[in-house]
Structure formats: structure tokens, C-alpha cells
Amino acid sequence: MSKIYDWFEERLEIQAIADDISSKYVPPHVNIFYCLGGITFTLFLVQVATGFAMTFYYRPTVAEAFASVNYLMTDVNFGWLIRSIHRWSASMMVLSMILHVCRVYLTGGFKRPRELTWITGVIMAVCTVSFGVTGYSLPWDQVGYWAVKIVTGVPDAIPVVGPAIVELLRGGVGVGQSTLTRFYSLHTFVLPLLTVVFMLAHFLMIRKQGISGPL
């Protein structure tokens, strides 16, 4: 085993990477509330894992969406548990994200030189809420359908461009298959990709600048 390790160590400098990760300075004022960002990240990983598992059974069509969710809940082994964990962790992720934003704001973690870290965090917060809005509609039951109709109808109040935004969100004048396809694409591809990109930037800046000091 030592020869295998030495082979990788010679090429990748694994020990140097491990030392850099393990020797990062942690200020003495850090408490349990500074773990909220990590908790949010952990819940995001749970969302990815359970969401990926559900894509094997979910069918994003207005005719089959509800039936596929019902099949997952009643016939698939542990399907009810996977969906329940997805739903519970989604609620917990939103809560931990809100608490994390509040902690950063109240402790002044958004101030110079960490403005970009704050901006990427706010963008991820918007993505998190968008996850909830798009995911809520995917079962395409009565609650999901009317939620989509109301949410996508809100921009209609904007002068001039409002109707165009509504049509863009819905994929047409009314709510239907195009709307479900758009929301499914946003929920499973666009939003996860954006979140991962800004999350990497967020983490890199935290590693570079460290944790902000006490007030």
C-alpha cells in the first residue's frame, strides 16, 4: 500500500493538500451558528441524491406526472422514504439557508473584503427558493397546478414586459405541458448547475479570505 501511496504522492502531492485543508486557521469566536452554511450544503447533497433517485421513476408530462409520483410512493421499494426525505430536507435547507444569511448579516460577514462572497451567497439563496417553486409543481396535482398558475401570473402586473415574461415562464399563454417541461428543466438541470458554479466560487473565496472576525 505504501508504494501505491508514494506513487500518487509523487504526482499529486496529496500530503500537501491534506495539510492545507487540515491546518486552516479557525478564529476563536466561531460558534455553532457558523455551521449553518455547512448544514445547508449537506442538505443540498441530500437533495441531489434523492432527486436523482426520483428521476428514474418520474415522468414530466401532464398526463403521467401525478401517476408516476403515486407509483413512486406506493409501489417502489422505499420510494415513499426517498420522496419524504427529499421533501423534508428541502424545507430544512430553506430554513438553514435563511438562518445562515441572518448570521452572516448580523455578524457583518458581508463587509469588505467579502462583498463577492456575500453576492454569490445571495444568488444561491435565490436559487434555493427557486428550487422550491419549481419542485412544488412537479407532481402536477391540484396544489402544484394552481401554485404554478399563480406564481407565473405574478409578472403580468409589470407594465409593458409583464405579459411577455408570463408567456416565457409558461411556454405559452396558458399553463400546460410546456410549463411543466420548463419547470422540470429548471429544477433538475439549470438551477443545480447554477448552484454548483456559485457554490464553488463561494467556497473558494471563503478559503482565500477566511472566516470574518468578530464585531
UniProtKB/Swiss-Prot annotation:
Protein residues bound to heme c: C35
GO biological process: photosynthesis; respiratory electron transport chain
TM stretches of this protein: 32-52, 90-110, 116-136, 186-206
This protein's record includes keyword Zinc: no
The entry's keywords: Chloroplast, Electron transport, Heme, Iron, Membrane, Metal-binding, Photosynthesis, Plastid, Thylakoid, Transmembrane, Transmembrane helix, Transport
Gene3D superfamilies, sorted: Cytochrome Bc1 Complex, Chain C (1.20.810.10)
Subcellular location: Plastid, Chloroplast thylakoid membrane
Residue positions binding heme b 2: H86, H187
Topological relation to the membrane, as annotated: Multi-pass membrane protein
Cofactor remark: Binds 2 heme b groups non-covalently with two histidine residues as axial ligands.
InterPro entries: Cyt_b/b6_N (IPR005797), Cyt_B6_PetB (IPR023530), Cytb/b6-like_sf (IPR027387), Cytochrome_b_N_euk/bac (IPR048259), Di-haem_cyt_TM (IPR016174)
Keyword Metal-binding attributed: yes
One Gene Ontology term, aspect cellular component: chloroplast thylakoid membrane
Pfam family, one: Cytochrome_B
Gene Ontology MF, one: oxidoreductase activity
Main location, first listed in the record: plastid
Residues annotated to bind heme b 1: H100, H202
Top-level taxon of the source organism: Eukaryota
Other notes: Heme 1 (or BH or b566) is high-potential and absorbs at about 566 nm, and heme 2 (or BL or b562) is low-potential and absorbs at about 562 nm.
Functional summary from the UniProt entry: Component of the cytochrome b6-f complex, which mediates electron transfer between photosystem II (PSII) and photosystem I (PSI), cyclic electron flow around PSI, and state transitions.
HAMAP family membership: Cytb6_f_cytb6 (MF_00633)
Family: Belongs to the cytochrome b family. PetB subfamily.
Complexes and interactors: The 4 large subunits of the cytochrome b6-f complex are cytochrome b6, subunit IV (17 kDa polypeptide, PetD), cytochrome f and the Rieske protein, while the 4 small subunits are PetG, PetL, PetM and PetN. The complex functions as a dimer.
Name this polypeptide is given: Cytochrome b6
Underlying gene: petB
